[in-house]
Amino acid sequence: MGLSEDLHARARTLMQTLESALNTPGSRGIGTANPTIYDTAWVAMVSREIDGKQVFVFPETFTYIYEHQEADGSWSGDGSLIDSIVNTLACLVALKMHESNASKPDIPARARAAQNYLDDALKRWDIMETERVAYEMIVPCLLKQLDAFGVSFTFPHHDLLYNMYAGKLAKLNWEAIYAKNSSLLHCMEAFVGVCDFDRMPHLLRDGNFMATPSTTAAYLMKATKWDDRAEDYLRHVIEVYAPHGRDVVPNLWPMTFFEIVWSLSSLYDNNLEFAQMDPECLDRIALKLREFLVAGKGVLGFVPGTTHDADMSSKTLMLLQVLNHPYSHDEFVTEFEAPTYFRCYSFERNASVTVNSNCLMSLLHAPDVNKYESQIVKIATYVADVWWTSAGVVKDKWNVSEWYSSMLSSQALVRLLFEHGKGNLKSISEELLSRVSIACFTMISRILQSQKPDGSWGCAEETSYALITLANVASLPTCDLIRDHLYKVIESAKAYLTPIFYARPAAKPEDRVWIDKVTYSVESFRDAYLVSALNVPIPRFDPSSISTLPAISQTLPKELSKFFGRLDMFKPAPEWRKLTWGIEATLMGPELNRVPSSTFAKVEKGAAGKWFEFLPYMTIAPSSLEGTPISSQGMLDVLVLIRGLYNTDDYLDMTLIKATNEDLDDLKKKIRDLFADPKSFSTLSEVPDDRMPTHIEVIERFAYSLLNHPRAQLASDNDKGLLRSEIEHYFLAGIAQCEENILLRERGLDKERIGTSHYRWTHVVGADNVAGTIALVFALCLLGHQINEERGSRDLVDVFPSPVLKYLFNDCVMHFGTFSRLANDLHSISRDFNEVNLNSIMFSEFTGPKSGTDTEKAREAALLELTKFERKATDDGFEYLVQQLTPHVGAKRARDYINIIRVTYLHTALYDDLGRLTRADISNANQEVSKGTNGVKKINGSSTNGTKVTANGSNGIHH
């Protein structure tokens, strides 16, 4: 047989096996998840009184964990720190309970080894980066049990963890929990010592709580009346898992419906032919699914009869539709629709992009998609917004793989575009279409840049997710420029997966990609996704059927790639990667045009053109090259800021070129008065359309737009105060530059400049007259807003909580300003002499008889050396700031914080590299570009202006 026949044969066998467990009389179900140390440890704790003695009921499970402790004292699981912590905590509790076991005299020593491991691991644990089910309840519960044995730990996030624990407890309605099934039954072991397990026997289903061995074990431990049903369930699971190793249990069993629905929906989504998969078997599955859906009145849970969830319900409804046993989505919508997204179930900590992607996919398969148009648009908006606001890839709370979210989001969003192309869903806006297109291309860009040399993206299941994503997004016309490379990548991924498909190796720890209390793998899922990835058509849909996306230029990405590809920083990057950045940049253009200007319409005139089309590339490419991509929203905020800086700076330059000292003194006073008034910028005065705005009105409008930015409102007063101060110093420094230029014109260029030293001038006036420093501090406020929004507290905190950190950040800003000033001067020498703008090489340190720089080449070389020095000082400063911030927020978060702030620095560094490339005035470089000498042609008669010539040298974000 060929590969296609083999794929269908594997799919057929998989579904027949699962269906047999579903319909065979007497079957208690099936589950192919790997056994877990965590759940096995809970079962090992179960004891009961027999003949007046306390006896452990499942001693064989304790023997298993006893024999599988690792050399460092831990039980590692998938190798992640959090799984090692949770596993080891549970096993340490079990060890302490079994310390009196005379047959294992080294238990105390093993317990000390586990304790030593935890003492170190808990100190390294970053709670804010943790995504495990109920970890904020489970870890405190286990720590409290250890307290009873005299074992305690101190660690940096101890108080934060217990505050989360107390907050969650305070929200629980115990009477409601005891009354009926809820998702909390899945993790009730976390409430040992809090919950009254005697009030829960009626919630048992087939001897278990939501198919969870750990909760069932906790119930047996704490209920005062022994329940034979629960004991029988645990014994049965141990028996089922005997082939996996001696006396273990998984995190979930049975998983019959979960495995059927997830496996079959994946096979359908990726074009497996149901006619080749035993149609009678599939029909029996459909009838059983419909039976349970009817019993649940249109919704169902992970296990029928338990808490309803949107994930299970949505996929079941979709399958019934494609298996010709349709059921209405009405009850599903009523149960799960929330104001801005669909919830998975009650009590969830946060919304899930994968759940909403599944809901969207399901509604798009309804017989009449337009009936649910408002819900479809709502979910699509939510999913697109998640991608819009996320840096890099989107991770989800149900799967550790960064590609799982990409797979489900791409399937749903591309099908949305397909349906829209058929004339459905007419209320979808052009803005949403644009955001969907950007989201999809973000996925493909990140995946292409992350493939490993062997063709994989991690384990086989993760590689399957990535390949399926590529197949879906390849349906978009936006991929045309990189389609050849895309197909090569897909072929290399298939070459990696095909031998694995035939070999069927046993699962390894790295295959545990599914998130529960610890991670786990599921054999049927690995098979289903592997078969799906090798079968999916490439592209999933004909690109001509995705016909309603806003058109984008097919030439601009090539121009951007060719122009910026000349820079040393980009030369090593392959052509496809530079083109990918070009496509991302081109997609951002309409988004920038949609944002209202932060300046006056009259001020904006003449400020548009090719330069603004180049701007997104200058933000996307450097960040991506460093492996620190920012969110689309963050990039847009930066671009809007640059546009506002450019327009404001341009207007002031052009209108102040003939200003007298008296004019400048008057404007300085107005600026100081404006920023000294605490009421300033709380409201904005209207300016009649029939006159040009005054200088102070332009400055006020610009400052107002930043200080009242909607994504900076939750920044602390200290951080916003720093932004306010930076804006004031920038405009005052601009006036000081104008005053210097007046003196320069009066004195003449041939006279030696007397006064402030070059060092002091570049570090005070020169650095302050750099718009990029405003951008850095504005990014600080955006970050502060994000931090305080996540905290959900009215007590707003500073991004940098200590005087040392604040000083270090301001030092980075100063070095950045000085670097920008020097770089601007280095690349503007000819322009500044022609226009009589003060430049670094006009200072006596460069022109004096003993300066050692008596030639233009020597002066430029000296200035280049200083520019390199300050650029390195900026890099070193940011790196040191990361190190000092790490103890406060954790290593990953510290790095993420600084990456957000550094975006504008990378943008300016690119300008510096452009200047070094041309070694001439940037405006001359732009003239070359417009003539086509650098391989970039004119488009529609407009030149590709890369910067502007100004009176005082403040060229937008670069300066």
From Swiss-Prot:
Residues 931-959 are annotated as: Disordered. Its cofactor is Mg(2+). Keywords: Antibiotic biosynthesis, Isomerase, Lyase, Magnesium, Metal-binding. Mg(2+) 1 binds at D649, D653. Pathway: Secondary metabolite biosynthesis; terpenoid biosynthesis. Changing D649L: Completely blocks class I DTS activity, abolishes the production of premutilin, and leads to the accumulation of mutildienyl-diphosphate. Induction: Expression is up-regulated during pleuromutilin production. GO terms for molecular function: isomerase activity; magnesium ion binding; terpene synthase activity. Residues 1-542 are annotated as: Class II diterpene cyclase. InterPro entries: Terpene_synthase-like, Terpenoid_cyclase/PrenylTrfase. Residues 940-959 have a biased composition (Polar residues). Its EC number is 5.5.1.-, 4.2.3.-. Mg(2+) 2 binds at D649, D653. A motif (DXDD motif) lies at residues 309-312. Mg(2+) 3 binds at N824. It comes from the Eukaryota. Binds 3 Mg(2+) ions per subunit. Residues 543-959 are annotated as: Class I diterpene synthase. The active site is at D311 (for class ii diterpene cyclase activity), D649 (for class i diterpene synthase activity). Belongs to the terpene synthase family. Bifunctional premutilin synthase; part of the gene cluster that mediates the biosynthesis of pleuromutilin, a tricyclic diterpene showing antibacterial properties. The geranylgeranyl diphosphate (GGPP) synthase catalyzes the first step in pleuromutilin biosynthesis. GGPP is then substrate of the premutilin synthase (PS) to yield premutilin. Premutilin synthase is a bifunctional enzyme composed of the fusion of a class II diterpene cyclase (DTC) and a class I diterpene synthase (DTS), with the corresponding domains and active sites containing characteristic aspartate-rich motifs. This is Bifunctional premutilin synthase.
